[in-house]
Amino acid sequence: MRRGFGPLSLAFFLFLLALLTLPGDGNQGSVAGSCSCDRTISSGTQIPQGTLDHIRKYLKAFHRCPFFIRFQLQSKSVCGGSQDQWVRELVDCFERKECGTGHGKSFHHQKHLPQASTQTPEAAEGTPSDTSTPAHSQSTQHSTLPSGALSLNKEHTQPWEMTTLPSGYGLEARPEAEANEKQQDDRQQEAPGAGASTPAWVPVLSLLAIVFFLTAAMAYVLCNRRATQQNSAGLQLWYTPVEPRP
């Protein structure tokens, strides 16, 4: 008789089955069993800041594989050790939807949020509104963003992002903008009316010319037909045969 599977063989078989059917994280859109890597970064390797920023920006999904984590980008995949600091930061950043493109919101949009929040207290100077709420939201956003995102915000700050408008600027400029828009509408309405008066005679003259031409052609055809009929009648009378006398 054949011997059955022993406990060790059964345990090894179950372990292989568990590795093959290891489920992925559904929130990150990972595919079960897709642990192939285009590039593997060894543990302890110093990653350039530009490479890390590129992964943050184009990260679409990640998959938890045995002993490492696979990050899926737009055109390739990058793998790193699950215990590495940069790997854990990327996973936390993607789970909080602060980086990557898999959420329908790019990292480029997220990294400009602190500048937008800092404009609120400056634009609200001179108004009786409470400034504690913008400060609280600013501190909350700074605390939720990772350290790499804060450094990127400092590096990529543009001069136009820090410009502030004086209070009441929109209220004063709005009537002038409405008046200018109204004047432009009036000019656009007057221009077609003035230009349409002269070309209005063109189709009328063309129509009259066509009617005159058709009338002359019909008169010519009728005159020719009548003259032809008269000539044929005269010929018939001229060549009328005479019956012989008996």
UniProtKB/Swiss-Prot annotation:
Amino acid composition bias (Polar residues), ranges on this chain: 128-146
Subcellular compartments: Membrane
Extracellular side: 27-201
Cytoplasmic side: 223-246
GO cellular component term, pick one: extracellular space
Topology of this chain in the membrane: Single-pass type I membrane protein
Gene Ontology molecular function, alphabetical: chemokine activity; chemokine receptor binding; low-density lipoprotein particle receptor activity; scavenger receptor activity
UniProt PTM comment: Glycosylated.
Coarse class of the protein's main subcellular location: membrane
Disordered: annotated segments: 104-150, 175-198
Source organism superkingdom: Eukaryota
Record-annotated disulphide pairs: 35-65, 37-79
Signal sequence annotation: 1-26
Chain ranges passing through the membrane: 202-222
Keyword Membrane: yes
Keywords noted in UniProt: Chemotaxis, Cytokine, Disulfide bond, Glycoprotein, Membrane, Signal, Transmembrane, Transmembrane helix
InterPro entries: CXCL16 (IPR026296), CXCL16_dom (IPR048585)
Organ and tissue specificity: Widely expressed. Not detected in purified B- and T-cells.
PANTHER family, per the entry: C-X-C MOTIF CHEMOKINE 16, CXC CHEMOKINE LIGAND
Family statement drawn from the similarity comment of this UniProt entry: Belongs to the intercrine alpha (chemokine CxC) family.
Function: Induces a strong chemotactic response. Induces calcium mobilization. Binds to CXCR6/Bonzo. Also acts as a scavenger receptor on macrophages, which specifically binds to OxLDL (oxidized low density lipoprotein), suggesting that it may be involved in pathophysiology such as atherogenesis.
The name this protein goes by in its record: C-X-C motif chemokine 16
Organism of this sequence: Mus musculus (Mouse)
